Amino acid sequence: RLAAVGEQRDAQRTVQLAEGSIVNLNAFSRVDIRIDDAQRDIKLPRGEATFKVSPDPARPFRVRTPGAVVEAVGTQFNVYARPDGTTSVTVLEGKVKVTSDHGGSALPVPLAAGEEAQVLANGRIEREAHTDVAEAVVWQQRKLIFKRTSLEDMAAEFNRYNKKTRIRLEGI
């Protein structure tokens, strides 16, 4: 089965997949879902989603962004395919493996609950232990938190959520 979900600027959606997993999709995000007897494959070409994965060791659950592949069996994690080509992965419960999808023979990086990794546009994976997982999913409460973020990136993130009020930077 193949299905596409998402693309609305100001709407978050929760989707329960036929095999029991739950996808919380952020605003202006899209997932393409392919589930069959051999695989559970989710493409996240743009945006952000939290996945609560039903255990099924025979069919690993894979989320593919333009720059990374995240694999889980039964866990909960957040993935954000950023506009700059970086993919952020935060593990809320359980464990996942993160692999760069930029070619080469990069080994998977294991992450456990409370850990985060950034897969950079050049394929390098930067791992951060003991992250604040609540901040990774604050978008589900329709809130934004910025740390070490340029004003331009903050405006772009705000505009992703809001179609009535837009921020435009001039002369900066």
Please state what every model-predicted region is:
Residues 1-172:
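A residue-level detector for the "anchor" residue at the start of short, highly conserved motifs
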